[in-house]
UniProtKB/Swiss-Prot annotation:
Name of the coding gene: Smim23
Taxonomic classification: Eukaryota, Metazoa, Chordata, Craniata, Vertebrata
Organism of provenance: Mus musculus
Pfam families xref list: DUF4635
GO cellular component terms, A-Z: membrane
Segments in the Extracellular topological domain: 53-136
Protein name: Small integral membrane protein 23
């Protein structure tokens, strides 16, 4: 009888968890995480001092270099890229608050999922006590 009672509560808890998981907007989360990843990578390049440069010279590798190859294939930007930084700052001012709200919402949803999981585990394992016949 106890097993059926626990099974019913466990099933109800599992249904609640499954409903929350289905109602979650997975695409929105993926887009947010992708945008954050791109933002972190872009800011990381700016902070580390790396610039967008492509060089035709391969001095540090062990490949054979043809001396006839023209050296005009070098493209390097030595000047700071102010326009992309200005654009990024403007975009951050506009969208950072929205990202923060989405992240806070994600944290609240994860906390709720943890509470649901704790409830489900309590419902599933809560009635089992050492004096039950299963433990003898």
């Amino acid at each position: 009888m106890t097993i059926q009672k626990t099974g019913c509560r466990g099933r109800e808890a599992a249904e609640v968890v499954e409903q929350r998981r289905r109602s979650h907007h997975c695409d929105d989360r993926k887009q947010t995480l992708l945008a954050l990843l791109i933002l972190v990578l872009y800011l990381g390049m700016g902070i580390s001092g790396s610039s967008w440069e492509v060089s035709g010279q391969t001095k540090d590798c062990n490949h054979f270099q043809n001396p006839v190859t023209p050296q005009g294939f070098e493209y390097q930007t030595k000047e700071p890229a102010e326009e992309p930084l200005r654009t990024l700052r403007k975009w951050l001012k506009i969208n950072l608050h929205g990202f923060l709200e989405k992240l806070e919402k994600e944290v609240r949803e994860l906390e709720q999922l943890v509470r649901d999981l704790e409830f489900w585990l309590d419902a599933l394992l809560g009635d089992l006590r050492p004096e039950d016949p299963c433990f003898t």
